[in-house]
């Protein structure tokens, strides 16, 4: 077999396994007997660490399997049957999830992007145009807004942009959901001014990516307002996103949120990106 250790790969950020600290902890705990479905001490510890990192002590935290399942589950849980989710026309749920949202019975209502992002003004106009239409009761109602941090183009929402989106969403009773599949990279970017605390303040739900950020798999959904999505555990199960061996995800997120690892784990990627940027100038 060809030795590929010295080769550079640009295809993806999840071609390798997991951070050594995660693998070490998984091996140390491998033969322990724990309760299933995320009711174990490791998962509870991970949830508490995430609440602390987000400065959201009352938040509901749930660990799911992967990004597409997470998006499909959260969006379905937040929408009524006749509602759709607003997203950029380049948004991940609109372009690279094989119609998973539509498969769940909800339309993705796309708006034109600017560098991968959408604005508060666009949301305001979309809502106004919807209710100004005499036939709006025959149409798919905008029921929530989806963004990702970073975007599909690798751009970042600023704190000011996020706050503006949050304001218009709350004025129009539209939950704001942030896809954080690659959130570790956003947090590590020198251009970033949005913290986990900001995400908890300005969004109705967001997830902290594990699969693309150092874990073998797993995403942590944070719902800042406790009880905001009733029976979410059961909804996760219904969508096939619940792990029987839940502690495997709990251990991973427990390690990611020990000694600031998650906040550091994206830095090598940022440093490499700066090297590429400098070389292309």
Task: Give the residues covered by each predicted segment.
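Conserved PLP-enzyme active-site core in the AAT-like
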Residues: 2-281
